[in-house]
């Protein structure tokens, strides 16, 4: 995330906070607890490395709700996350972590840049999930890294790189099953991880239509099935409705799981 100079503060409880960082989709603020940060989810939408910009009404609150629900659920499955609580519908309290400057992308079906770079046909089901690493650097355009390049750049060591891959594949298994129960296909998605004060790697950032490519199983049309930020990228329209559909299905599935497992 890009660092910005302090701007007008906001108030959380009785504590006044200066903005720490602002990224494309979220703003981070400190809290009274140095181990806790407040994330504000924005309605801003960007694509193509911020070359295309716009607003999606209500996106911040929708993405916050979806992410919170999925983080809570993943915690019950033994996946550590940075989630703590949501004080408001577009705000999330999270554990402070040192973000590893890698975007970890898992692909189940050929789409997006994978098709452009390889010539694979969109919609091709991959024989095995593909894990890719992208260097988080806006100036370089977040380039795709090989395993060896990631080690060469020193962004992490080999043991942690393997941990990131293993965690991503584990999360993918859980999310694929979850979204299938929502009648949605998880095509691909992006994850970010960070290390806490003890050095433990935990899942951070968000899981939402901004970071996942999601297709509606009830729609055969290749445009109508899109339920994610591709609607913004490709000017497909009905962006808010698509995000709302994902939110409704995710929260309904969470309610079903809670009725079976108890509250989480």
Swiss-Prot record:
Protein keywords: ATP-binding, Ligase, Nucleotide-binding, Purine biosynthesis
Known catalytic reactions: 5-amino-1-(5-phospho-D-ribosyl)imidazole-4-carboxylate + L-aspartate + ATP = (2S)-2-[5-amino-1-(5-phospho-beta-D-ribosyl)imidazole-4-carboxamido]succinate + ADP + phosphate + 2 H(+)
Record pathway: Purine metabolism; IMP biosynthesis via de novo pathway; 5-amino-1-(5-phospho-D-ribosyl)imidazole-4-carboxamide from 5-amino-1-(5-phospho-D-ribosyl)imidazole-4-carboxylate: step 1/2
PROSITE patterns named in the record: SAICAR_SYNTHETASE_1, SAICAR_SYNTHETASE_2
GO molecular function, one term: phosphoribosylaminoimidazolesuccinocarboxamide synthase activity
KW Transferase (keyword) present: no
Any single biological process term in GO: cobalamin biosynthetic process
EC number: 6.3.2.6
Domain of life: Bacteria
Family: Belongs to the SAICAR synthetase family.
Protein's UniProt name: Phosphoribosylaminoimidazole-succinocarboxamide synthase
Gene name of this polypeptide: purC
